[in-house]
């Protein structure tokens, strides 16, 4: 049920393109033109006819009045439908200046994109960190930075605009992750900075001067924390386990920043959480040590069945978006083994 996989042939001197997409069943799709825009109706009918099998794509191009056929390639058609949609932030690439940005919903069986929240609704605002409780539209959390900034929480029956910077807290709430019950939401609080390199392949470095992890209870409007998550170390990227009794996060030893930014490497850690009363365990467990890998872990995401945890691995730091060497890894939570994806 995925949307048509349109593509273009980018070779030089291409005058025409001929494409045939066919399976063992159903009516083949034949297209001509410089770009391949597959009609949605024909595409979905072909996929429906070949569920659990493969379709084959044959591409021919005309260059210099001669036709050349590329090697055909298969596309496997899953017997299961694709998820309904995705939600993401969309903005033009840049470092400091931005104009229009927002949080958008994309229907995966089509190319339909719907704005959920745009910064045109809030003057000169940066709309960024957002989270839903698993695959449900509510509850949700969106962070808005700027003169009219707030943490926006939709509990399903009310919409709240909150100043989440509590007394003595490093910042307002930043990276979010909902408790499966919807009764709590974990956040990191970060003093984040960016710097530009004078040379080299990485133009920019984003780093924390300090960071902690807290848990917010929307019903009582209380920030919950423990000294174990508010140390001199950098704690960030919280994520609850599917049963809601473990809080995963990343932690790195404090270094002089930005001088020693390459020495900051985050381990994957966890602490027990008791949803009955919103309290924490009395120790931190290290699941994967940065010292062992000599790498840095960021963005931990546990699977909903509780069997696995996916994370990003990079050379250093926690803002792996700017790191070309960053890659996804998968941790087996039962065996402790992890592998590159």
Predicted regions and their residues:
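A short loop-to-beta-strand structural motif that recurs across blades of beta-propeller domains
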Residues: 102, 150-152, 212-214, 267-269, ...
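Asp-box/WD-like beta-propeller blade repeats and closely related beta-sheet repeat scaffolds
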Residues: 71-85, 93, 158-212, 223-236
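Short, aromatic- and glycine-rich surface loops/edge beta-strands on solvent-exposed regions
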Residues: 49-64
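Multi-bladed beta-propeller domains
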Residues: 1, 26-42, 109-125, 154-172, ...
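Short, conserved, GDST-rich strand-edge loop motifs in beta-rich repeat architectures
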Residues: 84-97, 187-209, 249-266, 311-325
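Conserved beta-propeller blade repeats
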Residues: 122-141, 166-188, 229-247, 257, ...
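Conserved, compact domain cores that house catalytic/ligand-binding motifs in diverse enzymes
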Residues: 85-162, 168-169
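Contiguous beta-strand segments within globular domains
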Residues: 1-13
